[in-house]
């Protein structure tokens, strides 16, 4: 039995609150257990200079964490005057993952700004951000469709992410919380599409190694978890799903 009573292959409770904010074109509050992230999507009617004239859009992301999202207060990065390497890595990961499933040509010369703000952290903040950001982005695209600025919702597939790991005395477990993540022998983040294609796999042994058999078991667990997350995304999107499938 895991520390929170879940089975080894069981996700934490997932809830996606849509249209959580008033102003953005798309927004959600995603709850993955005690991890909570506000994700918003903003449409800008222009692209970065390096993309001008190509007839394609762009998706980029920013990620941050409020000071008391964690057990001990952390200083705001804006107070330090620079973004940490961890934050930069996560921002790039989110943007890169979303671009993998966006039809950039169908989007046209527009930029989608994704903002992910962690308001409570209990492990898996980057994977929750990706799963929530996808829904916020599709909500924003639906606004473009309603305004007849695009001919279809410009996504090629669903996108979700989760964590898996090898935890002492438990073996392979799905969707690690902070207590599990902090003592995991192997920690892995997996991003996949709704059709089961891999977008990114980040796996690391923490003073440990893992076998090919364990790698396969980790990926199998992640795949099943991601398919469940995609179903949660579909529930949150409601009728919009008909424009994707």
UniProtKB/Swiss-Prot annotation:
The UniProt catalytic activity note for this protein reads: tRNA(n+1) + phosphate = tRNA(n) + a ribonucleoside 5'-diphosphate
Q: Where is the signal peptide?
A: none
UniProt GO BP? rRNA catabolic process; rRNA processing; tRNA processing
Q: Where does phosphate bind?
A: 86, 124-126
* UniProt keyword annotation of Nucleotide-binding present: no
Asked if the keyword GTP-binding belongs to this entry, the reply reads no
**EC number(s) per UniProt?**
2.7.7.56
Task: Give the EC class as a word.
Answer: transferase
Q: How does it assemble?
A: Homohexameric ring arranged as a trimer of dimers.
Q: Which PANTHER family match?
A: EXOSOME COMPLEX COMPONENT, EXOSOME COMPLEX COMPONENT RRP41
Function, in words: Phosphorolytic 3'-5' exoribonuclease that plays an important role in tRNA 3'-end maturation. Removes nucleotide residues following the 3'-CCA terminus of tRNAs; can also add nucleotides to the ends of RNA molecules by using nucleoside diphosphates as substrates, but this may not be physiologically important. Probably plays a role in initiation of 16S rRNA degradation (leading to ribosome degradation) during starvation.
Query: Which HAMAP family does the protein's record reference?
Result: RNase_PH
Concerning its family, UniProt says:
Belongs to the RNase PH family.
Q: What is this protein called?
A: Ribonuclease PH
């Amino acid at each position: 039995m895991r520390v929170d009573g879940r089975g080894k292959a069981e996700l934490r409770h997932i809830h996606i609150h849509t249209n959580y904010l008033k102003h953005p074109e798309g927004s959600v509050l995603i709850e993955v257990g005690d991890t909570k992230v506000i994700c918003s999507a903003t449409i800008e009617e222009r692209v970065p200079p390096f993309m001008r004239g190509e007839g394609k859009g762009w998706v980029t992301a920013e990620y941050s964490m409020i000071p008391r999202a964690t057990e001990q207060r952390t200083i705001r990065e804006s107070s330090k005057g620079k973004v940490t390497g961890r934050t930069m890595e996560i921002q790039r990961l989110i943007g890169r993952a979303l671009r993998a499933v966006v039809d950039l040509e169908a989007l046209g010369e527009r930029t989608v700004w994704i903002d992910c703000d962690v308001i409570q952290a209990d492990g898996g903040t980057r994977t929750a951000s990706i799963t929530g950001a996808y829904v916020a982005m599709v909500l924003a695209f639906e606004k473009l469709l309603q305004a007849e600025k695009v001919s279809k919702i410009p996504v090629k597939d669903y996108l979700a992410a989760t964590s898996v790991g090898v935890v002492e005395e438990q073996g392979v477990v799905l969707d690690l919380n902070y207590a599990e993540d902090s003592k995991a022998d192997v920690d892995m983040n997996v991003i996949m599409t709704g059709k089961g294609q891999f977008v990114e796999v980040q796996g690391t042994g923490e003073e440990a190694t893992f076998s090919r058999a364990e790698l396969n078991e980790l990926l199998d667990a992640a795949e099943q978890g991601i398919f469940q997350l995609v179903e949660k995304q579909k529930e949150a999107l409601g009728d919009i799903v008909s424009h994707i499938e």
